[in-house]
C-alpha cells in the first residue's frame, strides 16, 4: 500500500509539473506569435521579463505557471490586432479572458505594474477595476520583473527604468504623469520583492 501511495504521489507530481510546462509553453508561443515580428523590441522586453520571472519563481517558490505565464503575456495588449481601448493592460486582459485563459493570469495582466492608477488617470478605471487585484508576493513579483527589465530585455534598476520611461514619453504625457504619481507604490512592491529574495521578508 505504501509503495502504491508513493507511486501515485510521484505520478501526481509529474502531472502537475507537466501541466506547468504546457501552460507556460502555450503562453510563450502566444506571445511569440503576435509580438516577435510585429513588435520585436517589445518581444525582447517580454523575453527578459519572463526569464526573470522564472528565476524569481525558483527563488521564492511562487506559483510558477501563473507568474511566468503572466510575464510572457503581460504586454500582449500592444499587439495591433488586440488593441481595443489603446490601454494595453486592459486590452490584453480582455483578449486573454475571451480565449479562456486562467483567471489569475488574466487579472495579473490587467493589473500589472499598477495599471489601475494609469487607468484612473485615463478615465477608464472602472473598466480595469472589474479585474481583481491579487496583491501579495506573486503580484509584487510581476511588477518587479517588469520594472527591472529594460525595453530591450536587459536588467536595469527600477529607478533607472522610471527615468527611462519619463524620457521616452516626455513631459505632459499621460504615461509620464502615471509613472511619476505611481513611483512610490511601484518601488514599494519592488522593495518587498527584493526583501523576499534576500530572505528578509516572509509571507
Where would I find each of the regions flagged by the language model?
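Extreme N-terminal basic, low-complexity initiation segments
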Residues: 2-10
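Short coil-to-beta-strand
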Residues: 23-26, 66
Amino acid at each position: 500500500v505504501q509503495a502504491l501511495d508513493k507511486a501515485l504521489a510521484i505520478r501526481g507530481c509529474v502531472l502537475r509539473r507537466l501541466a506547468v510546462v504546457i501552460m507556460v509553453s502555450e503562453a510563450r508561443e502566444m506571445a511569440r506569435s503576435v509580438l516577435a515580428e510585429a513588435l520585436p523590441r517589445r518581444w525582447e522586453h517580454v523575453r527578459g521579463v519572463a526569464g526573470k520571472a522564472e528565476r524569481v519563481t525558483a527563488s521564492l517558490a511562487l506559483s510558477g505557471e501563473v507568474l511566468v505565464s503572466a510575464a510572457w503575456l503581460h504586454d500582449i495588449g500592444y499587439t495591433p490586432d488586440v488593441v481595443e481601448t489603446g490601454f494595453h493592460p486592459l486590452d490584453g486582459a480582455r483578449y486573454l479572458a475571451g480565449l479562456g485563459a486562467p483567471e489569475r493570469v488574466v487579472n495579473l495582466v490587467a493589473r500589472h505594474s499598477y495599471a489601475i492608477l494609469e487607468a484612473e488617470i485615463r478615465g477608464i478605471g472602472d473598466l480595469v477595476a472589474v479585474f481583481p487585484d491579487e496583491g501579495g508576493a506573486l503580484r509584487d513579483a510581476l511588477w518587479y520583473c517588469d520594472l527591472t527589465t529594460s525595453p530591450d530585455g536587459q536588467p536595469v534598476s527600477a529607478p533607472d527604468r522610471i527615468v527611462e520611461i519619463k524620457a521616452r514619453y516626455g513631459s505632459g504625457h499621460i504615461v509620464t504623469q502615471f509613472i511619476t504619481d505611481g513611483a512610490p507604490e511601484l518601488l514599494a512592491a519592488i522593495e518587498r520583492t527584493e526583501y523576499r529574495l534576500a530572505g528578509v521578508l516572509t509571507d
